[in-house]
Amino acid sequence: MLGEYRQGDADWSGGFAFAQFSFPGGGRVELLAPGNDPSGFVVKFLERHGEGVHHLTFVVDDLRAEVQRLRESGQRVFGENYSNSHWMEAFISPGLDGSRVLIQVAQSDQTSEQQDDDWRRHPLDAVLKAATRFR
């Protein structure tokens, strides 16, 4: 199965590099690498857990309602950000049972294609070159 490069940035403002690929049927995979900020969340994650899955994202129609539902069910929600209607997000804290994968819940007023057009920052080779400097 081949993925198609959709968007990426060699040093996103959040302090990390990313490349996102889409697959037939609608699935996407986003690869993260540390950016120029040595105190960024990707660096901290790698120091604590090593390489692996950081988070899974589920897109919902109403983020505020979903966050309320999650809290009412006993989930610990953090990192809520409602400041940009193009991408609002919250995270569910992993349990204390050893799981290290975060769950991201997100809402957008844009289609995936509109996000790709808005967020495409750099060609894939520039993103990969930036990411390999941390090997």
Residue ranges and their predicted role:
Residues 90, 96-98, 117-122:
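Short terminal or interdomain "cap/linker" segment that borders an active site or interface and mediates
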Residues 21-25, 92-97:
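Active-site beta-strand termini and strand-to-loop segments that position acidic
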Residues 6-7, 38-43:
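A short, acidic/glycine-rich surface segment
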Residues 1-28, 65-86, 124, 130-135:
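Core segments of cupin and vicinal oxygen chelate
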Residues 27-38, 105-108:
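Amphipathic N-proximal alpha-helical interface segments
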Residues 103-135:
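Acidic/histidine-enriched, glycine/proline-rich intrinsically disordered or flexible terminal extensions
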Residues 29, 42, 59, 72-84, ...:
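Phosphate-end processing signature that detects enzymes handling 5′-triphosphorylated RNA
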Residues 17-25, 43-64:
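Vicinal oxygen chelate
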